[in-house]
């Protein structure tokens, strides 16, 4: 009996995986199914399932492949995918490694267009206030391909309409995977410069794939963030891109964009000529009207007889002067009458007896005051003589007149022999004069 061979789980799984990988029909398969268990992982691989009414298969889409998907996959969306079938040893299940995906029934680009359109509309990018296009620009920036017909059409149109404006080309890719970033970068660059008035972005017609860079979110965000007004001219008139919806103004063609960005110089000159003519006519009319007013004034009675202008005022002054003089006389007469009345009342109310009594009282008071003053002066004189006698008795001169003297040395009074030295010069002061002396001896009396 043959002995059974037991395989490990890994060995069996690897064997089955090799079968999957060796099958040429599984190297490239195309599936239609409904997305299930999808949760968007930012900047990472995507894991989900595809199912129909009867079956379900796990799917993985690596980050590099998912970056090429133009729309946003959603739960329950029916899609068409392509990829290879293989087995994942970790759980022993087979799965499809998806390398491309597009919506079933609707183009992937159209689906992406509608999704981004809804997203930006909800954010308010389409309804935001549009910047006005400068009427008389000095410098216009153009973002387009340097080799396309767009730049030639714009230059031709602007040269014909408004040759004094300066056009500056900012070359950008307008087709391909790098075009959107190229366009957005140039818009941002222009906004760092201070001397531009308007931006024109555009390219010629083409398929939706050709025009797709102008449907990218990065371009829409750059246009919305622009501090300068943006005119979009992408494709033909029937083509409407996301850039057209966000831009401040949309033009059907590059020529139309140039016309929207510039006035016609000849029209401006004609308008200036009209304004000049209107100004001249208006000035002449004003001058004529003022001349007629001057003539009318010259013919008026004020200029013919200027004294009539102030005759009424002179008459009023005379009348007012007479009224003032009359009023002054009246006030003086009234004042004199009032004075006489008051004087009569005063005379009538002053009895002679009261006046006489008052005079006697005043005279009596005067005599009493004189007597008091005389008595006080006599007392003060006696007191003064007594004080003088006392002071005279105590006066040094009075004492010196009785034979006493006082000694000074260097104008200082000598009070003791201790203040003197041999040969000191001293002065003897008498009541009627002085004498000088020199100390020869000093005798001290013992106490």
Swiss-Prot record:
Bidirectionally degrades single-stranded DNA into large acid-insoluble oligonucleotides, which are then degraded further into small acid-soluble oligonucleotides. It is found in: Cytoplasm. Its main location: cytoplasm. The keyword Cytoplasm applies. It catalyses: Exonucleolytic cleavage in either 5'- to 3'- or 3'- to 5'-direction to yield nucleoside 5'-phosphates. The gene is xseA. It comes from the Bacteria. Heterooligomer composed of large and small subunits. Belongs to the XseA family. This is Exodeoxyribonuclease 7 large subunit. The keyword Nuclease applies. It comes from Pediococcus pentosaceus (strain ATCC 25745 / CCUG 21536 / LMG 10740 / 183-1w). Keywords: Cytoplasm, Exonuclease, Hydrolase, Nuclease. GO terms for molecular function: exodeoxyribonuclease VII activity; nucleic acid binding. The lineage of its organism: Bacteria, Bacillati, Bacillota, Bacilli, Lactobacillales. Pfam families: Exonuc_VII_L, tRNA_anti_2. Its EC number is 3.1.11.6. One of its GO terms (biological process) is DNA catabolic process. One of its GO terms (cellular component) is cytoplasm. It is an enzyme of class 3 (hydrolase). CDD domains: ExoVII_LU_OBF (cd04489).
